[in-house]
Structure formats: structure tokens, C-alpha cells
From Swiss-Prot:
Major location category of this protein: mitochondrion
Function as written in the Swiss-Prot or TrEMBL entry: Core subunit of the mitochondrial membrane respiratory chain NADH dehydrogenase (Complex I) that is believed to belong to the minimal assembly required for catalysis. Complex I functions in the transfer of electrons from NADH to the respiratory chain. The immediate electron acceptor for the enzyme is believed to be ubiquinone.
The organism of origin for this protein: Scyliorhinus canicula
Protein name: NADH-ubiquinone oxidoreductase chain 1
Residues that span the membrane, as ranges: 9-29, 43-63, 77-97, 106-126, 146-166, 177-197, 228-248, 259-279, 299-319
Length: 324
């Protein structure tokens, strides 16, 4: 009984701690890449080559006094960052890396459902802060997230038709001979751009546009609660890129050496994450109307047309006689 209880405790911790460590060092990689792209060094003082900078930042944030605005809603103000990080970590559970903690039959729908709940944490934090800048950022986030979830859901539906199942293990099996990136490259491009918008990253960072809304929905947050929001954002970035790899660049599972599958998945996800950072350094922010036009006038008709094509083609070819 004790052994089973310990196993249930250790398994999630062994899953969560590496994710949080990767998230911490992703912030360092981002600052380094942005630094080199702007012809400067980036963090290079704390530890060798600045490698201890994330630890210093974490300590600084968590030992500071959390300041709460006097007019804010205390319970909502403190609960939303915690819920944001919990939801971000919960979405990792069905991912095969190469084994998942919970093997769900509808793993993709679970991830989509949990990712849609994250918008409530942003809206709650903006409303609870009692600040017009925070509320404006939160309202932008709601409209942006709901809009891009439409395109994400339709792209996922098309990929499910491709792979033939809702489980993420099915995608690895379907891609043993060829990556789905090759026949489904228009979907892959739209998916990647939609993940940028879903994670509120540049050039779609309208929720926390520094030049417009000071800092967006988290302007009133400091110290620990701010760090939780920060961790949730970067955890979502890693999750979306890992999911992109599973959907479009699936890794074959080798039962003799499962670590090769994990290493391959990690390297591909790292490449996509670096591309996220490269895009941030290269492109200016979209205007709000351009952001909405992109999803409703471009992505939505395209994804609907591709779904119809993927559904119609197998039905049309089943009536053909055998070519013998």
C-alpha cells in the first residue's frame, strides 16, 4: 500500500520537476538569443556564461514581498496565478514522452479543453486587479484565445482524420513511414501560427503589449504570483511545441531504447521553441484587426476546405474498382 502511494506521488513529481527546470532555462535561452540578435551579450554575469541566471531570477521573485492592490479582489487575485500554472502542467499528462502518465482515449480533446480553461485565469487576473490596463489586456486575451482555438480545433480535427484516432500514441504509429508534416504542410503552417497566438507570443502579444498596456493583464502582479504566471506562459510554449512535434513530426518508439524517442522528441521541440524566440526578435506586433482578420478571413475558410477535402477523398476513392 505504501509503495503504491509513493509511486503515485513520485511519478507526477518526476514528470513536473524537469518541465519546470526546462521552463526556467528557456527564459535564459530567450534572453541569450534576443541578445545575440540585437548584437549584445545577454546575461553573462551570474555563474559561468550566465547559466545560473534563472536560479537568481527565481530566488529574487519568490523572496520578494507580494504586493496586492488595496482595491483588488483578494481571493481571485491570488488564486488565478496558481490555477494558471496548475492547468499548464495538467496538459502535459497525456503527452507520450514516450510514455504518458495517463493514457486517455481522447487525449487531444483533453488538451484542447484544458487549454481553453486558461483564458479564465487571464480574465480573472485582469478583473481581480481592478486596473483598466489589466482588464483591457484580459479582454483582448479572451477574444484572441477563443478566436484561435477555433482554427486549432479544426486543424486537430483534420489531423485526427489523417491519423485515424484521438490518442496521441496513434500519431506516432501513423508516422512510422512518413511525417504528417509532408502531406499536411498547409495545416502545419497554420497550426504553428495559431500556437503563437494561443500562447500570446510575439507578433501576437497584444494581451501584454508593453508599448500599449504597460504590461497587460499581469501589471498589478509582483514577486511570487508574477513568477507563477511567467512559469505558466513558458510551460505552455514548451507544451505547444512538443504537441506540434507529436502531431506533425512523430517519433517512432523503440522498445529496446525508449530514451532515443525522448531525445529525438526533445531536440525537435527545442528547434521549434528556438523558432518561437527567433520570430519574437524579428517581427513587430500585429494590429488587433489584422490579428482577427488572419483567423476569421484566412485560417477558418482554409481549414474548413481542407477538412472537407480530407473527408471527401477517402469516400470518393472507396467506390473505385480494384486496379488489377
Amino acid at each position: 500500500m505504501l509503495q503504491t502511494t509513493l509511486l503515485y506521488l513520485i511519478n507526477p513529481l518526476a514528470y513536473i520537476i524537469p518541465i519546470l527546470l526546462a521552463t526556467a532555462f528557456l527564459t535564459l535561452i530567450e534572453r541569450k538569443i534576443l541578445g545575440y540578435m540585437q548584437f549584445r551579450k545577454g546575461p553573462n554575469i551570474v555563474g559561468p556564461y550566465g547559466l545560473l541566471q534563472p536560479i537568481a531570477d527565481g530566488l529574487k521573485l519568490f523572496i520578494k514581498e507580494p504586493i496586492r492592490p488595496s482595491a483588488s479582489s483578494r481571493s481571485y487575485f491570488l488564486a488565478t496565478p496558481t490555477v494558471a500554472l496548475a492547468l499548464a502542467l495538467l496538459m502535459w499528462m497525456p503527452l507520450p514522452l514516450p510514455h504518458s502518465i495517463i493514457n486517455l482515449n481522447l487525449g487531444l480533446l483533453f488538451i484542447l479543453a484544458i487549454s481553453s480553461l486558461t483564458v479564465y485565469t487571464i480574465l480573472g487576473s485582469g478583473w481581480a486587479s481592478n486596473s483598466k490596463y489589466a482588464l483591457m489586456g484580459a479582454l483582448r486575451a479572451v477574444a484572441q484565445t477563443i478566436s484561435y482555438e477555433v482554427s486549432l480545433g479544426l486543424i486537430l480535427l483534420s489531423m485526427i482524420i489523417f491519423a485515424g484516432g484521438f490518442t496521441l500514441h496513434t500519431f506516432n504509429l501513423a508516422q512510422e513511414t512518413i511525417w504528417l508534416l509532408i502531406p499536411g504542410w498547409p495545416l502545419a503552417f497554420m497550426w504553428y501560427i495559431s500556437t503563437l497566438a494561443e500562447t500570446n507570443r510575439a507578433p501576437f502579444d497584444l494581451t501584454e503589449g508593453e508599448s500599449e498596456l504597460v504590461s497587460g493583464f499581469n501589471i498589478e502582479y509582483a514577486a511570487g504570483p508574477f513568477a507563477l504566471f511567467f512559469l505558466a506562459e513558458y510551460t505552455n510554449i514548451l507544451l505547444m511545441n512538443t504537441l506540434s512535434v507529436i502531431l506533425f513530426m512523430g517519433t517512432s518508439y523503440n522498445p529496446l531504447m525508449p530514451q532515443i524517442s525522448s531525445l529525438s522528441l526533445m531536440m525537435k521541440a527545442s528547434m521549434l521553441t528556438v523558432l518561437f524566440l527567433w520570430i519574437r526578435a524579428s517581427y513587430p506586433r500585429f494590429r488587433y484587426d489584422q490579428l482577427m482578420h488572419l483567423v476569421w478571413k484566412n485560417f477558418l475558410p482554409l481549414t474548413l476546405a481542407i477538412i472537407l477535402w480530407h473527408m471527401a477523398l477517402p469516400l470518393a476513392t472507396t467506390s473505385l474498382p480494384p486496379l488489377t
